[in-house]
Regions:
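Iron-sulfur-associated redox domains of electron-transfer enzymes in respiratory
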Residues: 1-205
């Protein structure tokens, strides 16, 4: 899991486009927050064998206005990456911005947007008691950072990803994906330092 986005994606027109692709028998991999996945299923009103859905473990979604203020502060118009891992998962660098055609990396200690986000101060009220924050996941596959288990920083300097196959459909996709290095784990390890897998913000705070 790389290049996380701490803002909700714009889904305008995307559900209609996905339906068109599915009706033409194209394979579709749709990723988003759990509520976006649920929204897609609600729009389609049926399941397609050639549709695969992937959700992130969501920490709540800030509004667009907060991001716009962040960009204005740094006189930037574009965020290239929210999680720069050139020097590893645990380096101090964090956000990469584009400013006047050049790139600027903002250290984590100077990234106010990230600090406020990590403190759960930017999330929408609708996220505070999210019904999708449950071990009964809505998508075929769930992804996130893997903070639990026995892995050492030195083994995987850019971090370890968590992949959960929530149903047979998702499991079959992972089995077919031959270029992944997969190691088995347990739900107990998965939820270590990842409470949003099963708790909404109101229960965490």
């Amino acid at each position: 899991l790389m290049n996380s986005k701490y803002i909700q994606s714009d889904t305008k027109g995307i559900y209609q486009y996905v339906k068109q692709l599915l009706q033409s028998n194209a394979y579709v991999l749709f990723s988003g927050t759990p509520c976006q996945i649920a929204g897609l299923y609600g729009y389609l009103r049926k399941r397609y064998d050639h549709l695969y859905t992937v959700e992130i473990i969501c920490h709540g979604i800030p509004g667009q206005e907060a991001l716009d203020l962040h960009l204005t502060h740094f006189k930037s118009t574009k965020i290239i990456s929210f999680r720069e891992k050139e020097y590893g998962q645990y380096a101090s660098q964090h956000t990469t911005l584009e400013i006047n055609g050049d790139t600027k990396v903002i250290a984590r200690k100077d990234d106010l947007f990230y600090k406020i986000f990590a403190g759960w101060l930017l999330d929408r009220k609708s996220c505070s008691n999210c019904k999708y924050a449950s071990l009964n996941r809505v998508s075929d596959i769930t992804i996130a950072d893997f903070w639990g288990g026995h892995y050492k920083k030195e083994q995987f300097e850019k971090g370890v990803s968590l992949l959960i196959a929530n149903n047979e459909h998702g499991h079959n996709l992972l089995v077919k994906t031959s270029n992944l290095q997969l190691n088995p784990s347990t739900i107990k390890e998965a939820i270590n330092s990842n409470p949003n897998l099963y708790l909404s913000l109101i229960h965490i705070s």
